[in-house]
Amino acid sequence: ESDEQRTDALEAVLEQHPDCLLCCDDRIAFDLMRELRNRHIRVPEQLRLASLYDSELLSGTTPAISAVQFDAERLGSTACRMLLDVMAGKDIPLRQVQGYQVILRESTK
């Protein structure tokens, strides 16, 4: 994905005047925060920002970015076990609920 593609995607989203943007991961959220700052869009006053993956990167931004925190190792282990079960012809649950915590920081207040 090029910078131009990301810029085009952001412009298309901003044209819809969202209240909040939820990013797939910490790096995207971090880069988006920088781009919003460059565009003089104030977070959270004009637009809230959050990530589906938490890391130290997000707590160090200004404002700090809200995120979902989960045990990535446990999630990966569960996914691997389920995949092995499928490959072995075993039945697996249609839904597997994992624990998580929403970390509210300044970017969504």
List PLM regions with ranges:
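Flexible loop/turn connectors
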Residues: 9-109
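Short beta->alpha junction loops
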Residues: 1-4
